Amino acid sequence: MNQLAMVNTTITRPLANYHSSVWGNYFLSYTPQLTEISSQEKRELEELKEKVRQMLVETPDNSTQKLVLIDTIQRLGVAYHFENHIKISIQNIFDEFEKNKNKDNDDDLCVVALRFRLVRGQRHYMSSDVFTRFTNDDGKFKETLTKDVQGLLNLYEATHLRVHGEEILEEALSFTVTHLKSMSPKLDNSLKAQVSEALFQPIHTNIPRVVARKYIRIYENIESHDDLLLKFAKLDFHILQKMHQRELSELTRWWKDLDHSNKYPYARDKLVECYFWAIGVYFGPQYKRARRTLTKLIVIITITDDLYDAYATYDELVPYTNAVERCEISAMHSISPYMRPLYQVFLDYFDEMEEELTKDGKAHYVYYAKIETNKWIKSYLKEAEWLKNDIIPKCEEYKRNATITISNQMNLITCLIVAGEFISKETFEWMINESLIAPASSLINRLKDDIIGHEHEQQREHGASFIECYVKEYRASKQEAYVEARRQITNAWKDINTDYLHATQVPTFVLEPALNLSRLVDILQEDDFTDSQNFLKDTITLLFVDSVNSTSCG
């Protein structure tokens, strides 16, 4: 008999009635034969890569052409092939600027803004004072700049790398948004597409794979595009897409074996969406293990979230929480029978992680994963306790707990553990206890989730979100609560940018997962993860289904 059928039917459960999977077993059709990368494709990619490398080498560092070339390569999603060259070039560009900044009289907004964004994107602090020359005595940007659409667009993109206290960039953001929106309908199709995409989602807060997929289409329609670069970007995307399709096929088989419909019918069926989350953090060929591990973790998190949120009773959750903290097979007998399949998946996950890390001589990393897991599962029980006792906590108390339940920190630490890079104990400790970027990323994930999901959640018995907490504590309207949540998200992005620019003792590969986890939730317009039949479905189709060579792409 189904274990769920054996559960006491007199118990009232706050079922969420989630829709069935959009994808089902679709990706099982991507067999190893269909996703095989041919020797001809590999050879052609290497030949094109060498030609693009020559373009980079032959273009002088301190030229506008070099800035545009690097920007194009990054947008097309192929910069990972040339990381070292780009790093050195941007360093040279920054050094030259610093040496001559008092003599610098560059009045080309397009160049100044692009250079600013690329330099900050490589973690060099270039002062926002470079934009002062484009303002009047009253600190407002000159209206004559509205004739330079590309300059406005570059300035708009640059503003998203601002840190606290940069009022000139706040002014620049308001100025560029106002004018880009008003002029967009009058632009030619190619420029209109760039402006529309930027206003919808700026580069800095978008995930690299989505940027690449959409920019390939935009770049193809720019008359001055470079055919060689476009061909390279398309082939590279095609090869990575095959690899991602194969991984999705393997993970779909794993998911099918878990028997979701019988063992976890109360939970969302989101395997493909979980993989999308993983690829948003790591898309490169060297990160296959990281994507697989992270996907499995997010699947476990999703089922657990629905268990605590939409099915189990408080009395069932107390022993389950204790069992997860113990992480031992002997705890199995202490939990309800219907919870045991999920607990077994949880144990298998950690066994697999430990086995793989032991091969790498990094078994001690598992300690950090288990510490974060224990914090996470206890925070879920705290939310269940609040719900049981009809407690709406103060905003700060809510955030302390809810930024753990959102699981961002656990995902982040897992990324660092399984990515394959060496990370010192000091770096782990810094990320967990001292960084701005980790708590800021968690806060963005939590508040964005509360903004887009709380109306749906309040239709059933559910714990308070930040919105309800703020309304109660400050006797505010829901609209005022939304405004405050968005203000805190904006400030959290400034914290992320601050660490990215100033935590120079920490390698970039340590910070990028936190940045990408923030980007992932930032691109969701509604509760797309839960109700993934619209925007997220279209995005997944772009990345994993549609051919990049299709005339209807994007």
Swiss-Prot record:
Return the Gene3D superfamilies for the record: Farnesyl Diphosphate Synthase, Terpene synthase, N-terminal domain
Write down the top EC class of this protein: lyase
Q: Which EC numbers characterise this protein's activity in its record?
A: 4.2.3.79, 4.2.3.-, 4.2.3.47, 4.2.3.59
Q: Name one GO biological process term.
A: terpenoid biosynthetic process
Catalysed reaction(s) here are: (2E,6E)-farnesyl diphosphate = (E)-gamma-bisabolene + diphosphate; (2Z,6Z)-farnesyl diphosphate = (E)-gamma-bisabolene + diphosphate; (2Z,6Z)-farnesyl diphosphate = (E)-alpha-bisabolene + diphosphate; (2Z,6Z)-farnesyl diphosphate = (Z)-beta-farnesene + diphosphate
Where on this chain does Mg(2+) 2 bind? Answer: 305, 309
Q: Name a GO molecular-function annotation.
A: terpene synthase activity
Role:
Sesquiterpene synthase involved in the biosynthesis of volatile compounds. Mediates the conversion of (2E,6E)-farnesyl diphosphate ((EE)-FPP) into (+)-thujopsene, beta-bisabolene, alpha-cederene, beta-acoradiene, (E)-gamma-bisabolene, (Z)-alpha-bisabolene, (Z)-beta-farnesene and (E)-beta-farnesene, and of (2Z,6Z)-farnesyl diphosphate ((ZZ)-FPP) into (E)-gamma-bisabolene, (E)-alpha-bisabolene, (E)-beta-farnesene, (Z)-beta-farnesene, beta-bisabolene, beta-acoradiene and alpha-acoradiene.
The record's comment on protein family reads:
Belongs to the terpene synthase family. Tpsa subfamily.
State what protein this is by name: Sesquiterpene synthase 14b
